[in-house]
Amino acid sequence: MNNLKILLAILIILSVTSISYFPTIENDFVNWDDDGYVIKNELIKEFTFKNIKKIFTTSFVSMYTPIAVLSYAVEYKIFNLNPHAYHTTNLIFHLLNSTVVFWLFLILSRNNKISFFVSIFFAIHPMHVESVAWIAERKDVLYALFYLGSMIAYLRYLKNFDQKKYLILSIILFIISLFTKPMAVSLPFVLFLLDYYYERKIEKRAIIEKIPFFVLAIFFSILAVYTESDAIERELLYSFPETTVFFFYRSCFYFFKLFMPLNLSAIHPYPNKIDGLLPFKFILSPFIFTLIVILLISLSIRFKKHRKTIIFGVLFFYITIAPVLQFIPVGQAIVAERYTYIPYLGLFFIVATFVQHFYDDYVKNRAIFKALFLLLFFIIVASTGYMTWQRCHIWRDGIIFWSDFIKNNPNSPAGYNSRGNAHFLIGDYRKAFNDYRNALKIDPNHIGASYNICILYKISGDYNNAITWCKRTIELKNDYAEAYGNLGDIFFFIGKKNDAKLMYREAIKRNEKFIPAYINIGVIYYYEKEYDISFRYLNKAIELGGRIHPDLFEFVKNYSSDK
């Protein structure tokens, strides 16, 4: 393939992708982790060495993703909280990834049509919208860039083992990818898969050179389990046979969504049991999975020359998606569309190979068939791009986003509660209240909705109802520090300072790093002229990263004997 054709292919891919994802540039933040990573993340708001150090020693939203968070810090320095800038950056990274994918599969397949097919469907597949249109999922498009780059560097090394610099480069890119998203831990196994594809013998050298990769993968796997440990309990609600069924369901889900990306949703919740049993589609999934396996085996037997590609593609898919197939359960969703960002490349490779086979055998030398084939390909690309373009609008803002989720999951209290939060953020308290009430109709014990109603009553000045709902929230979750803190605020507003201090202390007992409680109890002691005690609480708040008006702190400090 000459350079002009390569350039033309890349320009087509980038143009189609840019059009498909253009709506994301106009999108806002959504109230789903965007606050934790960007809006309320104080560490990105001052680009200092101290904050950079904290970024690399802190997990965000139960994940260790310092490189992704560092990219937000750079953006905040330049663009502040302009959401369009963050969305544009995500799209730029996705465009870069699409180009790298083309390059990678051009090296692997030595076929320009196959690499074009894989790249364009990677670029515009609707299942990948979540990775690009969601600001908080920057880690996906960023880790993929270094992950794929590491693969290409390793392929260069395979061509000439004397070129150790490419092996070193592969390790460096792998490290950066790991610091961006722990899902990169699958790479060492993918390198063995590349060895297989290039028919390299598994000898001593091939194993030794991968030891650094495995050491890094093991370390970051342990780190991921530690930082995401709070998400593991969800799957413990199901028995071992049921979790096994989930494996088959996930495999079937991802396989069918490759060809039929319909009924997409930002969150796919775990199923509710009916009379103690999982829904029928889950029970059926092991049998469907078996049929898929039979199909793949049949193809590999019938088309021997493509057997290596089939094995490579299937193993690539399972190796790269293995960290989120939940052998070690993480997260609150049974499946997630963003998890397919890199894994789908393996399946795209298989499909592209068979499309090429069909083209060569039945289309290539027949003018009419060739025209029909190109027309069909254009229609598929256009319709896929349009589906992606439509899906991008779902991420317009929090209200539209959660309304789409509620449409797909009408019995989910979390959807109503989250849409209520979106209404709350723009000051539409009436709609927020209605959504919180709807959440409680579905689940009367929903902690978030109960707490949020308390907040609404507090804002409206209805302190009696606020106290009632706050106490109700505490009954539902006794270790809810924020609820105690909020109750302390209400007591302070109505002049019950001793009760307020008691509630703030209760909040601190449940969360020793709950900064607002330290600040508020410190302020109460300031009003009571107990400057020693006030200083201790305010100083602790500052040590934890809290912000206090400097005049207040200096006054308390000067009058305190503890300074």
Q: Could you say what each language-model-derived stretch is?
A:
Residues 414, 447-448, 481-482, 515-516, ...:
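Boundary/linker segments of alpha-helical solenoid repeat arrays
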Residues 1-431, 437-448, 452-455, 482, ...:
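Polytopic membrane enzymes that build or remodel cell-surface glycoconjugates and lipids
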Residues 408, 442, 476, 510, ...:
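Structural marker of alpha-solenoid helical repeat scaffolds
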Residues 425, 459, 493-494, 527, ...:
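Register position in tetratricopeptide repeats
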Residues 533-563:
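Terminal, low-structured helical/coil segments at or just beyond the last alpha-helical repeat
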